[in-house]
Amino acid sequence: MRRVLEPELMTDEEQAQAYAQADFADVNQGFVDRFCAAFPDLTGGSLLDLGCGPADIPLRFARAIPGLTITGVDGSEAMVALGRQAVKDAEQDGRVLLLCARIPGLNLRPQSFNAVVSNSLLHHLPKPAVFWQEVLRLGRPGAALLVMDLHRPDSEERAHAIVEANAADEAPVLKQDFFNSLCAAFTLYEVREQLRAARLQAFRCEMASDRHWAAWGRLPKGAA
């Protein structure tokens, strides 16, 4: 199945609210656990979450690694508003900062983060190269990097089956977003080609579930 682009941002408040209320606990906690297992020596410093959504993952990192300060970035004002409320409710204002901004060209100091993570952002981007360029620009040499996203199935029928198997009870708007995201996602082969083009071919890149891939490693010295 060919890749079918979807809108880059969830700007609609109904979409954002449905996403925030959906049950991504297992996937999001699995993402944080994967990072902690891959980089057990990272116990503090600064972490950047690209495409942080309503801040569930930044807050999970704040709980998992008490020494971290976290900057979350999302291009959707509706998402960031929900995330800021979640951060306030969790009393993590001093450790978790959320910014509404888009890549490329984030107004953040180059090489300022010990770690960069991203879950389910890449498939929103028409040109994935800008994502990897921003990662290399913002992460310090040797920074830990974990990226996870959906894997594009080989047919629309398979995409519908994945939606029904994993989101049958979710709101219709979320189910449609899930289907669109599967159709816009990259295959494992395509991601490995992106890593090679970014000179990150030493990274591990493999399937993380029946519908997700994950890529992780440390940025090379002098990567920026």
Locate predicted features.
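A short glycine-rich, Lys/Arg-flanked "PGG" loop and its adjoining helix->strand segment in the class I
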Residues: 130-141
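N-terminal, positively charged/glycine-rich alpha-helical extensions of SAM-dependent methyltransferases
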Residues: 1-18
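Conserved alpha-helix/loop element of class I SAM-dependent methyltransferases that forms part
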Residues: 25-44
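Conserved beta-strand signature within the Rossmann-like core of class I S-adenosyl-L-methionine
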Residues: 143-149
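A conserved beta-strand element that flanks and buttresses the S-adenosyl-L-methionine
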Residues: 117
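C-terminal alpha-helical "lid/dimerization" subdomain adjacent to the S-adenosyl-L-methionine
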Residues: 150-198, 203-207, 212-214
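Class I SAM-dependent methyltransferase SAM/SAH-binding core
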Residues: 48, 55-105
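A short His-aromatic
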Residues: 123-124
